[in-house]
Amino acid sequence: MNNERKIIDSVETLESALASLKDAEKKFSTYTQEQVDKIFLAAASAANKARIPLAKMAVEETGMGVVEDKVIKNNYAAEYIYNAYKNTKTCGIIEEDKAYGIKKIAEPVGVIAAVIPTTNPTSTAIFKCLLALKTRNAIIISPHPRAKKSTAAAAKVVLDAAVKAGAPEGIIEWIDTPSLEMTNLVMKEADIILATGGPGMVKAAYSSGKPAVGVGAGNTPAIIDDTADIVLAVNSIIHSKTFDNGMICASEQSVIVHQNVYDAVKTEFAARGCYFLDPEETEKVRKTILINGALNAKIVGQSAFRIAELAGVTVPEGTKILIGEVESVDLSEEFAHEKLSPVLAMYKAEDIHDAFSKAEQLIADGGYGHTSSIYLNEITEHEKLDEFSARMKTCRILVNTPSSHGGIGDLYNFKLAPSLTLGCGSWGGNSVSENVGVKHLINIKTVAERRENMLWFRAPEKVYIKKGCLPVALDELKNIMGKKRAFIVTDNFLYKNGYTKPITDKLDEMGIVHATFGDVAPDPTLQCAEKGVEQMRAFEPDTIIALGGGSAMDAAKIMWVLYEHPEADFMDMAMRFIDIRKRVYTFPKMGEKAYFIAIPTSAGTGSEVTPFAVITDETTGIKYPLADYQLMPNMAIVDTDFHMSAPRGLTAASGIDAVTHALEAYASVMATDYTDGLAKQALKVIFDYLPRAYENGQTDVEAREKMANAATMAGMAFANAFLGVCHSMAHKLGAYHHLPHGVANALMIEEVLRFNAAEAPAKMGTFPQYDHPHTLARYAEVADSLGLGGKNDKEKLENLIKAINELKERVGIKKTIKDYGIDEKYFLDTLDEMTENAFDDQCTGANPRYPLMSEIKQMYLNAYYGKKHFEEKPMPTEADIAEDDSAHNFKQAYRRAENGKNKA
């Protein structure tokens, strides 16, 4: 060392030392891993070489412990700590995953305040100094007054070796004349406190206002089961309890013995040099263990013979442990406390459960979080071990192991980190519940690079298209799959009007037994699905055929789930998610009982190729869109024969529904090149052929077939890109006001297009690939694909909206919600609730503009009254209608605002 170290014996010298220490740490924090590892090796080697003189000094100064055992402690602190962490990265990049864009960088915490106990003054100092050096931290030691010289000597050995190996001078410091005032100052000025010692000191560390890593009180119980190897158990406990005269905090304080082996255990203890106190002697030792309710410092680390002398009890000089046979596990029993000496309480247990109860009480009274121990046949008694592990509130549960050696780690086990600071978790008032190591003394910076989600395109295994394809597609049920029982789900109209006959005729031809549920109503309810699944369970089909529009197919999907998994909870299935792959609820695997075929009879819903189903809770009227790829049909049969006689109203509503499917899929934050192509082509076909299908009906086969294909393509697009807030609002509009789903979408789509097209939205959608608001440009692309013209994106949007409105008009869709006869007062009365439910709809998450509830409410109002532009005209404020919140006055306020008489 170039500079002679200055003695720290006052607050002034301490403050000066702390300033120098911080400078040293700042320099040390720039060292490379190679430099640090060189210093770490040199310091550990020096400490190991000084193990004997340091042990002698500790015993001489404190008058506690056994020199030979302290040699082992010092050796352990140097050798085992070095071995455990010699290859551990603690500088710079310690972990990197380039594929996921994650990098972890280790930084030192700064200055460590280390509180050192009198029980292990040199080994703990070595341990903490080595951890500090490995993690590029500076450390200042506050020794116990009874062990200040030996603690300082240990620190100096490590410091000198570290500086010689290249560490900054003064990187390790210690208080030469410790006092409470200086210890408190150290804890106040440090960046982290590493506290090992009595409960008072540890509590002070945690109360200092600085991060602290500490220990808790130990009161280790050791249970000996009647299946235990008695020789192993007894000698392990003796070995542990006598190690350094019992001053390891994990050492056994009580032994609880099954009554079946109690005498044998007692005999073995006695044979190995332990002394059983008689009742009179037990009482004398009781009075020696505690003085005024606290542990008698005079017995700590003393030999059994010396403690017996203090108690006025005569025992052989070589006695290893004083054992008191006691019954109470309460705090009133002195033997039930932590003793830090070769004094042991011994209890008789009626059975293993009684032993567990006694151990629980001993831990609760003085050793929460620390250590517990059990001896048993771990091969045959795993149930006992499991119960012991479950019941003991300790962070170290040792099996067939001397707890002093086992608790500190890596001696009698090889995955418990070596340490002389044993965390006790929240049970022991600690922040750490494991053996303290280098990871607790570094700050880890995580560098997370932006990554876009893996995307996908998923569709039914088989999609059959073309007029008249039904019988050919169904052939597979017999010829390829060997199916025998088919259950058809449809609505009452289709059933009564013979739509199921082509299916049943083909099934009869193939010899496949069939049954039909024909009671699906529009907006199917959970009650309807449960009624259908009851019949399904009785019939036990291996094939389910859904025939109809969205209602029939959605109801059939729900029945399919309830049939295969009756334990499934509907509310769990309806739980919202942000990412379908990370959802809280995992959908059960489908298709194990029945193969699912979907056959649409209208061109719009797309349910035949989607993982979605909408079901209504009949008790609340709320529609729940369910989403999971387990709901994807196995086969879709798009046969135009089923579409030919669709009435005009259905043709119009379902056709505009398909328009909104394609538009929302194209604008979705999850849109891909695959879904874009399907969406744009679907829109082009619909604009060309929906008017013909509407006007010509069953005489225009081409128009019907084109519409059938367009609806299915739009379905494939939104099956993968998902939908948006238009559908969220339409779901609730239909639920509250019983508008057909396609009509509800038609009424909201203009508002949503304008809403999404904002270049500076209040909030944009959350998805990695959606990096900035660009929906206006997306809508312009749609306009271009439809050949609508426009000089810029805004003009193109207006042309797109105009074309959609003209299309709606051609197929008989009215302009406003009000035009459909929805009562104004009821609409306004339900508006807030409807708004919140729309916001919470599963479809909202993929919308490119994340909507505020106030914005959803505004769109509903605009769609009700026919307001054309979302931002153009102000809505009435709360103050405008504060005097009277009736629907009438709300309406008047709205009109005043529109007329510019009452500017909001």
What are the functions of these language-model segments?
Residues 736-827, 845, 869-870, 874-878, ...:
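Gly/Pro-rich interdomain helix-loop hinge
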Residues 93-232:
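Rossmann-like NAD(P) dinucleotide-binding subdomain of oxidoreductase/dehydrogenase enzymes
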Residues 455-543, 817-818:
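ATP/NTP phosphate-donor binding region
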Residues 2-103, 131, 271:
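N-terminal Rossmann-like NAD(P)+-binding subdomain of aldehyde/semialdehyde dehydrogenases
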Residues 8-11, 126, 202-330, 357, ...:
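ALDH superfamily catalytic-core signature
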Residues 3, 29, 313-453:
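Conserved C-terminal structural/oligomerization subdomain of aldehyde/semialdehyde dehydrogenase
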Residues 263, 271, 609-721:
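Carboxylate- and glycine-rich phosphate/diphosphate-binding segment that chelates Mg2+/Mn2+
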Residues 89, 154, 527-641:
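Glycine/threonine-rich beta-strand-loop-alpha-helix active-site module
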